[in-house]
């Protein structure tokens, strides 16, 4: 068996097209283009590339973007002041603070300072609580939304299927488990300290792995025909001295067992940014409904 490759780039392009059409309709209704503010503290090279990619894609779908580049020695109060200004700016519908932040800044305070209605990352405690309670109206983390779209591209109806999420972070694992549960999956959560992880993986119809441990899930961990979504991405050094991007799943082994699988790169990553755009449009629509 050779697994179907789930093309995250193609699906992300579909999401961006949907957002672009939604933005055009929003503007045609007489509203200003949705606005996304992106805040970067420091000069981490990888973060700068990621921010520029987000801004480029934001503008490509017809939304406005504003970047705020702050020095690495910015203190917490300065960042919180900027966030408050953005909270009060009606032209800004989404606020994204690029992580990681310098050590002098408390990440949890920053997340809580972003108004829930503009929290396009979906990390504010109020949005987390809405998702946990199954309430509508909140913003959901982008990567879990992207993972659900990837899964539904293979299984439009996942009710009754068994899903295992390996990884219990607040960014991916926990919110994703909630979304799967809302879709009537039978959901379990595991992590790197779970005993007998291989057995638990082999019971799953849908296996999502988000641990940041390269090659954690071997081919013999996978139920034949299962759908495997690899959220992890790590840079590993090969014997020849070159670097390679790899996921949490041993791809060459897994592709011979799974029914469908995401590649790394080109699987989950493009979907995360696509749903950042979708969340920004959702936030803009919600804002005008309140006027």
Swiss-Prot record:
Listed GO CC annotations: cytosol
Q: What Pfam families does this protein map onto?
A: THF_DHG_CYH, THF_DHG_CYH_C
* Key words of the record: Amino-acid biosynthesis, Histidine biosynthesis, Hydrolase, Methionine biosynthesis, Multifunctional enzyme, NADP, One-carbon metabolism, Oxidoreductase, Purine biosynthesis
Alphabetized InterPro entries for the sequence: Aminoacid_DH-like_N_sf (IPR046346), NAD(P)-bd_dom_sf (IPR036291), THF_DH/CycHdrlase (IPR000672), THF_DH/CycHdrlase_cat_dom (IPR020630), THF_DH/CycHdrlase_CS (IPR020867), THF_DH/CycHdrlase_NAD-bd_dom (IPR020631)
Q: Does the keyword Ribonucleoprotein apply?
A: no
Q: In which pathway does it act?
A: One-carbon metabolism; tetrahydrofolate interconversion
- The UniProt annotation places NADP(+) binding at 167-169, 192, 233
- EC number(s) recorded for this UniProt protein: 1.5.1.5, 3.5.4.9
Q: Which reaction does it catalyse?
A: (6R)-5,10-methylene-5,6,7,8-tetrahydrofolate + NADP(+) = (6R)-5,10-methenyltetrahydrofolate + NADPH; (6R)-5,10-methenyltetrahydrofolate + H2O = (6R)-10-formyltetrahydrofolate + H(+)
PROSITE patterns in alphabetical order: THF_DHG_CYH_2
A molecular function (GO) held by this record is: methenyltetrahydrofolate cyclohydrolase activity
Example GO BP: tetrahydrofolate interconversion
The family annotation for this protein states:
Belongs to the tetrahydrofolate dehydrogenase/cyclohydrolase family.
The record's subunit annotation is: Homodimer.
- Function, as annotated: Catalyzes the oxidation of 5,10-methylenetetrahydrofolate to 5,10-methenyltetrahydrofolate and then the hydrolysis of 5,10-methenyltetrahydrofolate to 10-formyltetrahydrofolate.
Can you name this protein?
Bifunctional protein FolD 1
Q: List the taxonomic lineage.
A: Bacteria, Pseudomonadati, Pseudomonadota, Gammaproteobacteria, Pseudomonadales
Give the gene symbol: folD1
């Amino acid at each position: 068996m050779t697994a179907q490759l789930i093309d995250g780039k193609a699906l992300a392009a579909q999401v961006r097209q949907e957002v672009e059409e939604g933005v055009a309709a929003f503007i045609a209704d007489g509203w200003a283009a949705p606005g996304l503010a992106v805040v970067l503290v420091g000069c981490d090279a990888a973060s700068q590339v990621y921010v520029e990619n987000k801004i480029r894609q934001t503008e490509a779908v017809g939304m406005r973007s504003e970047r705020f580049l702050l020095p690495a020695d910015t203190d917490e109060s300065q960042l919180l002041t900027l966030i408050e200004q953005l909270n009060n700016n009606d032209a800004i519908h989404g606020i994204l603070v690029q992580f990681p932040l310098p050590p002098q800044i408390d990440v949890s305070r920053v997340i809580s300072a972003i108004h829930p209605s503009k929290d396009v990352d979906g990390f504010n405690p109020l949005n987390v609580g809405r998702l946990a309670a199954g309430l509508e109206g909140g913003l959901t983390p982008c990567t879990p939304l992207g993972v659900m779209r990837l899964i539904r591209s293979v299984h439009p109806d996942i009710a009754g299927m068994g899903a295992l999420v390996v990884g219990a972070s607040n960014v991916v694992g926990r919110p994703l488990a909630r979304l799967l549960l809302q879709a009537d999956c039978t959901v379990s959560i595991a992590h790197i300290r779970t005993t007998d992880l291989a057995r638990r993986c082999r019971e799953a119809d849908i296996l999502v792995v988000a641990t940041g441990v390269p090659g954690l899930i071997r081919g013999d961990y996978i139920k034949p025909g299962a759908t495997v979504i690899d959220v992890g991405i790590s840079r590993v050094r090969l014997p020849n001295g070159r670097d390679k991007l790899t996921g949490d799943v041993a791809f060459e082994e897994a592709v011979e067992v799974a029914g469908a699988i995401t590649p790394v790169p080109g699987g989950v990553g493009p979907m995360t940014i696509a749903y950042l755009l979708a969340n920004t449009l959702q936030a803009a629509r919600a804002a005008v409904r309140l006027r």
